[in-house]
């Protein structure tokens, strides 16, 4: 293909040179040739324009005409190239052209852009937890208990392939967005990508279709999103977590599913990917807000029918660093959702709010995060959010994190904890009181796409009755983004 392109490019140049030695009507053929080479993608816009400009600067062949007044011959002015070139430009249908995008992996078809982005990762993980004894039993605990285990698995991120199709119609920027998140580990039957793993032969991995949404907006209007995408509450907590690139707490390591836990339930509640209708404002300086209505989620373990949607909102502020100086990203978000009663249990309303900030200077970063809620549970939204009588439990959590870059190396460390309270009349039990973890991480940027990562995670789970469990995990592998 490259050889063909060079050959045709040479032919175009030869045709161009021939213009000066052929009659004027041959210019039409040259214009047509250049146009066809551009339409087929052999000539880029820049190459086409350069050849056209070069052609226009060359003197056109001119016939001598008699000088009626002096009996001599004269040469007329050079205006003959303008007509054929203008005609060629008018014949060009820009919507038939396929162009390479300025950035990313994708292409432009007329007014429509198609962009692909994605990631693949894999890690060797060795997880060593406490023995499975009664004193180590914690209901809702995330520290591993049982035999030492090894696995080759995904980290907190599964793989993903995202496709964005965008254009402008009638002054509106519109887009269709699809995100597929396949894992490398085998799953159990039809339990879904986030179900239990099954490390046996003749099994297949799952695909998590997390993102399916449309967008439309204008620069001065903002953007409307309709479909399934990441939530607003607690989304910045996970997106700024260093374990997002690696493994973190490796729950279920003996039979891994699509993802590890990272710091989910160990400093923040998982935001989740949810059906929603969300409006995001334009940026006012560095300030932006978003609000949305969401598919109401049921209490995990109950199957109530909820008559009202959930509501979430977020405000962010960005200070972009200049010349490696000080930068900041700060956020506050919240959610409210009413749960209707079922089977004699009362209705309740879950509420939560969080706030966080990531500060950066040169190659150093510091992140702090905190959340508090009632009736929202821990680990995932509305998991363990009420007691057996339907009364709301309170919960909170935090994490702190620091990073330092040295050339292609980045070192990071973090600590976080999530706490779940008993209700006033709830008996003491093995119910989880807190999950916490320490993380140490080292990264090396092998290429612009590939990062090598090594990580150590210590996880501790404590129950309200005093039970306690601990585990250590070592992970080493790589992640690729494009």
Tell what function each PLM region has.
Residues 2-14, 21-121:
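N-terminal periplasmic/intermembrane-space "pro-region" immediately following the signal or transit peptide
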Residues 115-117, 173-177, 223-225, 288-290, ...:
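Residue-level detector of the transmembrane beta-barrel scaffold of outer-membrane proteins
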Residues 102-132, 144-298, 307-309, 316-319:
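Outer membrane beta-barrel
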Residues 110-112, 170-171, 219-222, 285-286, ...:
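Short coil turns and loop connectors of transmembrane beta-barrels in diderm outer membranes
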Residues 308, 313-440, 444:
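Detector for outer-membrane/organellar transmembrane beta-barrel domains
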Residues 284, 313, 470-482:
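Outer-membrane beta-barrel "beta-signal"
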Residues 122-128, 169, 180-184, 230-232, ...:
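Transmembrane beta-strands of outer-membrane beta-barrel pores
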């Amino acid at each position: 293909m490259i050889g063909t392109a060079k050959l045709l490019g040479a032919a175009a140049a030869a045709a161009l040179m021939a213009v000066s030695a052929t009659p004027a009507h041959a210019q039409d053929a040259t214009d047509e040739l250049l146009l066809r080479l551009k339409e087929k993608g052999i000539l880029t816009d820049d190459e086409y324009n350069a050849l056209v400009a070069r052609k226009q600067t060359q003197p056109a062949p001119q016939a001598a005409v008699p000088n009626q007044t002096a009996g001599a011959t004269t040469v007329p002015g050079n205006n003959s190239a303008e007509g054929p070139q203008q005609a060629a430009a008018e014949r060009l249908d820009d919507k038939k052209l396929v162009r390479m995008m300025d950035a990313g992996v994708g292409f432009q078809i007329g007014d429509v852009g198609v962009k692909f982005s994605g990631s693949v990762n894999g890690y060797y993980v060795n997880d060593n937890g406490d023995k499975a004894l009664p004193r180590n039993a914690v209901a809702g605990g995330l520290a591993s208990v049982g035999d030492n285990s090894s696995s080759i698995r995904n980290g907190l991120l599964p793989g993903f392939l995202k496709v964005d199709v965008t254009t402008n119609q009638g002054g509106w920027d519109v887009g269709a967005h699809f995100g597929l998140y396949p894992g490398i580990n085998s799953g159990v039957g039809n339990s879904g990508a986030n179900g239990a793993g099954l490390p046996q032969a003749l099994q297949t991995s799952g695909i998590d279709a997390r993102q399916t949404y449309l967008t439309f907006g204008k620069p001065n209007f903002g953007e409307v999103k309709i479909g399934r995408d990441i939530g607003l509450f607690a989304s910045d907590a996970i997106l700024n977590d260093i374990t997002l690139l690696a493994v973190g707490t490796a729950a279920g390591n003996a039979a891994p599913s699509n993802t590890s836990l990272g710091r989910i339930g160990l400093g923040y509640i998982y935001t989740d990917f949810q059906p929603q209708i969300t409006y995001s404002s334009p940026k006012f300086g560095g300030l932006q807000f978003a609000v949305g209505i969401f598919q109401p989620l049921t209490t995990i373990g109950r199957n109530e029918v909820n008559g009202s949607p959930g509501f979430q909102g977020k405000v962010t502020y960005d200070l972009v660093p200049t010349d490696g100086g000080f930068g900041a990203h700060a956020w506050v978000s919240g959610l409210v959702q009413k749960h209707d009663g079922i089977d004699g249990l009362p209705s309740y309303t879950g509420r939560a709010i969080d706030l966080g900030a990531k500060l950066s200077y040169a190659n150093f970063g510091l992140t702090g995060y905190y959340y508090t809620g009632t009736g929202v549970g821990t680990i995932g939204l509305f998991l363990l959010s009420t007691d057996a009588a339907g009364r709301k439990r309170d919960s909170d959590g935090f994490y702190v994190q620091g990073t330092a870059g040295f050339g292609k190396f980045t070192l990071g460390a973090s600590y976080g904890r999530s706490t779940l309270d008993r209700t006033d009349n709830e008996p003491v039990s093995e119910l989880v009181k807190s999950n916490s973890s320490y993380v140490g991480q080292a990264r090396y940027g092998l290429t612009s796409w590939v990062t090598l990562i090594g990580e150590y995670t210590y996880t501790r789970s404590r129950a309200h009755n005093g039970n306690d469990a601990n585990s250590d995990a070592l992970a080493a592998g790589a992640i690729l983004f494009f």
